[in-house]
């Protein structure tokens, strides 16, 4: 009756709660065969609890209090024994040194002891209790598992004669999903002085059980017979996880705490966060973690107990309004603070905290089967150590004897002067060594810096720094693009392609659209120089370029756009010279049929844009192309693709676009050209024919007959000229003075042209020339002299020679026709040859 009294049961419950952790287990899949290496590999933070992590507890030790001889020897299948247990922990009570045990994890199918005869079995256990407790984790270790489920399993064995046969207990824990974990308890070392008292056995774990699941605990008394296994079972539902409660509950904390209490509040235990000891001011500062809001606790009582844990020395009440809140790892944590003052030194004290079980309206917050009671959390004993006082020092003055001091100085050869000199010398030596080391390091660093500064810079980022690329890069490659102006969409694609070569691959690209200033200044010079200065020539094949080349080769009427552009004629002039370039690259856009390739370059490798763009770039730069230049989104390359897409859409919408936008143009004859486009010849070079019809019907004579005919005609003209000169002198009457010759019309000067021809024939006879000097030879001589007259002429530049031989000479001819030919001091023969003399006077030849 005494054992079953309510007071004793409450005291026993609190006693069991205050006890330490009995065992720490592995997860459900732990077996006897794998428990030993698993326990050795687990870190101490997983197996052992820190001093500030659990309240109340003390860290388990890896050996029993009795030593190895008390370890249970587990037998497996009768094959032998295992000397070393898989896991042995000290589960003794901190307040009761007489309680001891030894625990092993085994396989559920293992036989610990051999079977005994029937009737030799120990009695089965009774009064099995499963007490789950929700404990908050301390030491600021707030993570996903803010709370820990601590479960205590306790039972008793009846005091019978058969109890002497008891050697061990086998504890089987059946968890969810059919997972089982088994333990064996050695009770052979248990000594009970009073045979009338039945001992109570206790098993606790912090990791074996989970929140919100049903567990069945079966206790088997060992050894057992083949016919009977004395065992007892108990089932318990674990409380819900406080961290997951706010997700499940829709009501607020105030609504949950109105008029009722949480049934799981009696299973919650607090924990200490920090405990500070200040011996100088005799103060102990504690911080404890409060319960979640769903438990509805309104006040907490902090206590300071003596070393026995029974006498309360100090206490205080902390309300929920006085709690502080911190955010740790994204989770709100509430804790309370209190300072215990006037603490006695060198005395063991136990801090404790317990929630107040009643609310302000008097209802019970910790409802239990036997009444209203909350769990108290006790910490391990702490002590304020007394601080020892330093030894006292005397401030009294003493008389000194000069002789004694002198004797002391003589005994000690080292004086403060010696120390000062020695210290100065050492400092000087160290300074000199540091300076020398610094200078040496500086020289070494400077030499390395000079060596590192000698390197070759890659000014063209289009090339990668690979071994196949020369260290000394060439100058930027000049590229000329020759294309036909077929349509606005084709021109846009060519322009985007040129921008891609210029901006992405860093090439010096020349295009007629970009060189319009040079074209307007001198088209012929641009066409010639653009071919000469280009390292590479890119010919873009298209349908318009193909037909223009074919018709020009077959000498058929040309083809051009109905609405011509200012640069449409550039292709016809530039293509002939471009085909003579040593480095010609042929390409076409993807919308152009490969059959429209020029017949002169169809033997070359054809590049399709943009499909063969990287291969074409390698041919242009003569270096390996880098694909990363077009990796990702490139705005210039996207513009090229968009232009090609627009051209494709244009072709699909109008398949007959080329026939609709182009037409054939017949070649115009010279007579059809406008008058202002023809440069007139000087009068002396014009052929004068009196009867054009007769001139056209003239017969061809042999060269001998032609010479005789010209000789007879020359004699006749000389006679006529002499008679006219005499008549002219008679009319003038030989009056003295200068003779002024007025400019006459071309008809008056016609007779004067014959002496010029006669003089030329005389010169031809003297030089033994087979044919008469033509007009073309005279113009070429004039052009040669004009070239030497040009101050800006560069004899080594083909462009300047071309310009001086064509356009500049035409300007000189215009000046000759427009300028009056007057010279009063010239005689009649020079007047007949005024054009030639005028040229000589302009050039400066006398």
Swiss-Prot record:
Single Gene Ontology MF annotation: interleukin-17 receptor activity
Keywords tagged on the record: Cell membrane, Glycoprotein, Membrane, Receptor, Signal, Transmembrane, Transmembrane helix
PROSITE patterns noted in UniProt: SEFIR
Record's subcellular location: Cell membrane
Protein topology in the membrane: Single-pass type I membrane protein
Entry annotated with the keyword Transmembrane helix: yes
Effect of residue 292 to L: Defective aggregation behavior
Residue ranges of the TM segments: 419-439
Oligomeric form and interacting partners: Component of a heterodimeric receptor complex composed of ilcr-1 and ilcr-2. The receptor complex interacts with actl-1 and ilc-17.1 with the interaction being mediated by ilcr-2.
Its job: Forms a receptor complex together with receptor ilcr-2, which upon activation acts as a modulator of neuronal activity. Binding of the ligand ilc-17.1 to the ilcr-1/2 receptor complex triggers a signaling cascade that activates the downstream signaling components actl-1, pik-1 and nfki-1, and results in increased neuronal activity in RMG interneurons in response to input from oxygen-sensing neurons. This leads to increased animal movement and promotes aggregation behavior.
Protein name: Interleukin cytokine receptor-related protein 1
Source organism: Caenorhabditis elegans
């Amino acid at each position: 009756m005494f054992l079953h009294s309510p007071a004793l049961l409450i005291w026993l419950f609190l006693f069991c709660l205050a006890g330490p952790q009995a065992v720490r287990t592995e997860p459900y899949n732990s077996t006897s065969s794998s428990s030993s290496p698993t326990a050795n590999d687990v870190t101490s933070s997983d197996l052992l609890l820190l001093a500030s992590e659990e309240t109340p507890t003390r860290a388990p030790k890896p050996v029993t209090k009795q030593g190895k001889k008390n370890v249970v020897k587990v037998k497996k299948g009768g094959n032998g024994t295992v000397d070393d247990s898989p896991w042995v922990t000290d589960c003794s009570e901190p307040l009761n040194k007489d309680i001891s045990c030894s625990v092993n994890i085994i396989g559920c199918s293992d036989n610990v002891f051999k079977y005994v005869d029937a009737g030799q079995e120990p009695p089965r256990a009774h009064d099995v209790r499963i007490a789950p407790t929700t404990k908050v984790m301390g030491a600021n270790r707030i993570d996903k598992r803010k709370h820990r489920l601590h479960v205590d399993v306790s039972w008793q064995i009846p005091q019978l004669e058969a109890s002497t046969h008891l050697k061990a207990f086998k504890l089987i824990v059946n968890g969810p999903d059919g997972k089982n974990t088994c333990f064996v308890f050695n009770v052979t070392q248990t000594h009970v002085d009073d045979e009338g008292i039945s001992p109570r056995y206790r098993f606790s774990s912090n990791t074996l059980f989970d929140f919100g699941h049903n567990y069945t605990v079966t206790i088997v008394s060992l050894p057992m017979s083949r016919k009977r296994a004395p065992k007892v079972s108990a089932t318990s539902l674990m409380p819900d996880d406080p961290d997951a409660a706010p997700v499940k509950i829709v009501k607020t904390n105030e609504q949950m705490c109105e008029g009722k209490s949480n049934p799981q509040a009696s299973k919650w235990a607090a924990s200490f966060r920090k405990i500070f000891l200040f011996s100088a001011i005799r103060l102990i500062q504690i911080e404890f973690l409060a319960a979640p809001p769903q438990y509805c606790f309104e006040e907490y009582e902090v206590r300071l107990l003596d070393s026995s844990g029974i006498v309360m020395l100090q206490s205080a009440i902390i309300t929920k309004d006085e709690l502080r809140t911190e955010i740790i790892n994204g989770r709100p944590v509430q804790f309370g603070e209190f300072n215990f003052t006037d603490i006695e030194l060198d005395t063991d004290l136990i801090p404790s905290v317990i929630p107040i079980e009643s609310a302000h309206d008097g209802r019970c917050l910790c409802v239990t089967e036997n009444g209203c009671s909350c769990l108290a959390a006790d910490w391990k004993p702490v002590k304020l150590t007394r601080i020892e006082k330093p030894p006292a020092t005397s401030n009294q003055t003493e008389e000194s004897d000069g002789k004694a001091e002198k004797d002391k100085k003589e005994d000690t050869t080292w004086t403060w002067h010696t120390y000062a000199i020695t210290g100065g010398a050492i400092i000087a030596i160290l300074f000199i060594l540091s300076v020398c080391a610094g200078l040496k390091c500086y020289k070494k660093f400077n030499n390395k810096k000079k060596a590192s500064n000698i390197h070759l810079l890659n000014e063209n980022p289009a090339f990668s720094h690979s071994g196949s690329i020369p260290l000394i890069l060439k100058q930027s490659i000049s590229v000329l693009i020759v294309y036909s102006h077929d349509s606005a969409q084709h021109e846009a694609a060519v322009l985007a392609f040129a921008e891609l070569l210029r901006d992405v691959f860093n090439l010096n690209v020349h295009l007629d659209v970009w060189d319009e200033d040079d074209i307007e200044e001198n088209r012929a010079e641009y066409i010639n120089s653009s071919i000469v200065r280009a390292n590479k020539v890119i010919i873009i094949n298209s349908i318009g370029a193909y037909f223009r080349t074919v018709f020009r080769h077959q000498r058929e009427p040309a083809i051009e756009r109905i609405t011509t552009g200012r640069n449409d004629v550039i292709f016809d002039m530039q293509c002939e010279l471009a085909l003579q370039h040593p480095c010609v690259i042929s390409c076409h856009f993807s919308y152009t049929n490969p059959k429209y390739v020029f017949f002169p370059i169809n033997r070359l490798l054809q590049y399709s844009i943009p499909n063969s763009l990287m291969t074409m770039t390698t041919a242009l730069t003569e270096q390996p192309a880098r694909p990363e230049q077009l990796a990702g989104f490139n705005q210039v390359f996207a513009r090229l693709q968009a232009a090609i897409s627009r051209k494709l859409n244009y072709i699909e919408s109008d398949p007959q676009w080329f026939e609709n936008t182009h037409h054939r143009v017949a070649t115009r004859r010279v007579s059809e050209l406008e008058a202002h486009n023809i440069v007139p010849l000087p009068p002396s070079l014009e052929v004068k024919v009196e009867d054009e019809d007769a001139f056209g019907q003239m017969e061809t004579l042999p060269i001998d007959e032609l010479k005789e005919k010209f000789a007879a005609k020359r004699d006749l003209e000389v006679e006529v000229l002499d008679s006219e000169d005499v008549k002219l002198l008679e009319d003038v009457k030989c009056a003295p003075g200068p003779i002024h010759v007025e400019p006459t019309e071309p008809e008056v000067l016609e007779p004067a042209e014959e002496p010029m021809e006669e003089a030329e024939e005389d010169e031809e006879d003297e030089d033994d020339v087979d044919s008469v000097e033509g007009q073309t030879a005279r113009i070429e001589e004039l052009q040669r002299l004009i070239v030497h007259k040009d101050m800006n002429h560069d004899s080594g530049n083909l462009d300047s020679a071309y310009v001086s031989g064509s356009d500049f000479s035409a300007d000189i001819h215009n000046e000759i026709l427009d300028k009056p030919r007057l010279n009063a001091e010239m005689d009649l023969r020079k007047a007949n040859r005024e054009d030639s003399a005028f040229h000589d006077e302009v050039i400066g030849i006398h």
